[in-house]
């Protein structure tokens, strides 16, 4: 008999293939590989607790590559500082990092929220070609909204 988790992943795989979403398809493929080689029992807990940090590290490395290659240097930084778009980007970066901080706090204190956030991310990735950074930022937005609601209670 097929387990509920296998069926769920299979449905998500079909959605990923139909939506032509490579990230979702590869992620599910890796999860199936781990699950069916029985490595999942050892690897899944690690991925569940450290996966977000691992992903953020990989994204950070990718973002810093142009600095490492010399493509972006102090000259480009100075030129960017003259652009109001750069200042908007800077403020956005600060806002997103602060939202993500609240998201980590929310996911730690209220883990059942994770289910709704994961579903929202899956919908965005599969149907709208979104990028799967949604749970952390989504949790941050949820945390901010919940904090505002608490202020008015």
From Swiss-Prot:
This is UPF0756 membrane protein BC_4596. It is a multi-pass membrane protein. Its main location: membrane. Keywords: Cell membrane, Membrane, Transmembrane, Transmembrane helix. One of its GO terms (cellular component) is plasma membrane. Belongs to the UPF0756 family. The keyword Nucleus does not apply.
């Amino acid at each position: 008999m097929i387990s509920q988790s296998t069926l769920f992943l299979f449905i998500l795989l079909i959605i990923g293939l139909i939506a032509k979403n490579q990230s979702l398809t590869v992620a599910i493929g890796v999860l199936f590989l781990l699950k069916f080689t029985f490595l999942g029992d050892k690897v899944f807990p690690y991925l569940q607790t450290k996966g977000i940090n691992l992903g953020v590290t990989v994204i950070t490395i990718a973002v810093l590559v142009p600095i490492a290659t010399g493509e972006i240097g102090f000259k480009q930084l100075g030129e960017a500082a003259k652009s109001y778009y750069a200042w908007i980007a800077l403020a956005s970066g600060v806002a997103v990092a602060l939202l993500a901080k609240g998201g980590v706090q929310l996911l730690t204190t209220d883990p059942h929220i994770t289910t709704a956030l994961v579903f929202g991310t899956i919908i965005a990735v599969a149907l709208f070609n979104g990028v799967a950074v949604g749970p952390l930022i989504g949790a941050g937005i949820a945390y901010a909204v919940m904090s505002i609601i608490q202020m008015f209670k």
